[in-house]
């Protein structure tokens, strides 16, 4: 408990061990690592903790969930098992954006915007490491299935929409949770893909032979293959800088994509979807973005979401990116250095719990700007952000107290005997997917 409070109230820690210097952490630094090592945490424990505090959506008829994967670079942890090649942005031009480490999949609730509260908040629900022999998107599908089939959580019967980036638009992920009738998946599609309209048979055709499922091709990069849209709306939005944009949203219903046959057959012709295109224009009528936004909307109840809901739901997906950035910079989400994979996973669970505690304290935090921040527009609007709550959390802990019992000294540990030599840990190989064995000369 005190470790979670220390994470929530110390935004200046540069390493995990510095959390023991936080006033609310009354134990020794060795206890910090012992707590992480001995921690036992069920996968759905965090979701059950925050479930009583989740409010019902008021402005939209569905609960919005987000799923994404973020890297944990560990290129120097040579004794850490199951390291693989992962994505990592690289600022040096010409270098490949990869490094060595782990990947973690997070599922979170994307709540509606509250008055006086920053729009970047999320509510983390599940976090799990994607092993090198697993598909990281299908790990997210398993997490989503865990949420929806848990009767103690409010997601099993309510209409839920999940949003994901382009990696979640592949057939394997879209097919994974179609047995949940209350789930609608919104995923971005690459602009080079080709989909198909449903085939409409004529009365003159024979019914003999294999049924025809796919009609004419619909190429996202070829406008000549697109028929007239089934639905079109125009919405207006204003940026933070005050610029006004006009967004034209079109939809083609009952589209199909081809499935896969390996490693197992995916009958995607059974799951028609709506294809949504969003094009953004500035005040002069010129294109504000070079390329249009293409979205796939699949699910039995997809027609209960209008085009405006779909467009704004996908844009809220970027709050997950804000969470990962804040977690790694202010909560040391990727800062725990250990050769034990289980302890690393425990630390990720602890940081997700700490962020959830910051979210629950958002309404009792005071706005405490620094002297040079008092005249900033963001401070004048008094929108409580995760950084402001973390800056104020020490006062909250001192005011309401902590349920943790005060520590009691138990004597001095004998420690290691003089002359003890520890066996060096074996070095682990870096696992590379699809690595072909070397051919004999």
What residue spans do the PLM features occupy?
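Single, function-defining residue in the core of a domain
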Residues: 12, 78, 116-441
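Gly/serine-rich nucleotide phosphate-binding loop at the start of the catalytic core
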Residues: 1-39, 45, 50
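A generic secondary-structure signal
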Residues: 22, 52-53, 146-151
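Short, flexible loop/turn elements at secondary-structure junctions
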Residues: 23, 68-71, 111, 166-168, ...
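Active-site-proximal, Lys/Arg-enriched surface segment
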Residues: 35-119, 124-127, 264
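Contiguous, well-ordered alpha-helical segments that form the cores/surfaces of helical PPI scaffolds
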Residues: 2-6, 106-108, 351-355
């Amino acid at each position: 408990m005190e470790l979670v409070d220390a994470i929530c109230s110390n935004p200046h820690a540069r390493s995990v061990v510095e959390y023991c210097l936080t006033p609310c952490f009354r134990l020794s630094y060795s206890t910090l690592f012992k707590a992480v090592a001995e921690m036992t945490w069920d996968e759905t424990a965090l979701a059950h903790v925050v479930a009583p505090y989740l409010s019902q959506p008021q402005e939209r008829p569905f609960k919005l969930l987000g799923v994404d994967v973020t890297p944990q670079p560990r290129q120097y942890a040579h004794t850490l098992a199951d390291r693989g090649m992962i994505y990592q942005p690289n600022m040096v031009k010409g270098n490949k954006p990869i490094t060595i480490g782990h990947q973690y999949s997070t599922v979170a609730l994307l709540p509606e915007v509250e008055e006086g509260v920053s729009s970047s908040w999320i509510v983390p629900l599940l976090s799990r490491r994607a092993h090198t022999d697993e598909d990281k998107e299908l790990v997210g599908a398993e997490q989503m299935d865990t949420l929806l089939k848990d009767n103690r959580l409010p997601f099993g019967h309510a209409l839920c929409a999940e949003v994901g980036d382009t990696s979640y638009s592949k057939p394997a992920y879209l097919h994974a949770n179609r047995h949940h009738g209350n789930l609608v998946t919104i995923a971005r599609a690459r602009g080079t893909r080709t989909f198909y309209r449903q085939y409409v048979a004529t009365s003159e055709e024979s019914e003999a032979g294999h049924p025809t499922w796919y009609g004419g091709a619909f190429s996202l990069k070829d406008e000549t293959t697109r028929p007239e849209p089934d639905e079109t709306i125009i919405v207006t939005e204003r940026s933070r800088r005050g610029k006004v944009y006009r967004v034209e949203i079109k939809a083609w219903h009952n589209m199909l994509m081809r499935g896969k046959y390996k490693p197992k057959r995916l009958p995607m012709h059974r799951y028609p979807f709506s294809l949504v295109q969003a094009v953004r224009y500035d005040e002069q009528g010129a294109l504000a973005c070079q390329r249009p936004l293409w979205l796939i909307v699949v699910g039995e109840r997809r027609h209960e979401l209008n085009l405006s809901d779909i467009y704004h739901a996908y844009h809220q997906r970027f709050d997950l990116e804000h969470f990962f950035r804040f977690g790694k910079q202010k909560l040391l989400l990727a800062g725990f250095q250990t050769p034990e994979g289980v302890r690393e996973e425990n630390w990720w669970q602890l940081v997700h719990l700490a962020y959830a505690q910051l979210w629950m304290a958002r309404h009792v935090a005071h706005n405490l700007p620094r002297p040079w921040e008092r005249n900033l527009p963001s401070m004048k609007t008094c929108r409580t952000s995760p950084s402001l709550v973390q800056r104020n959390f020490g006062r909250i802990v001192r005011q309401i107290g902590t349920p943790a019992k005060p520590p009691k000294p138990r004597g001095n540990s004998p420690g290691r005997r003089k002359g003890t030599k520890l066996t060096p840990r074996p070095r682990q190989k870096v696992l590379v997917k699809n690595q072909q064995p070397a051919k004999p000369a």
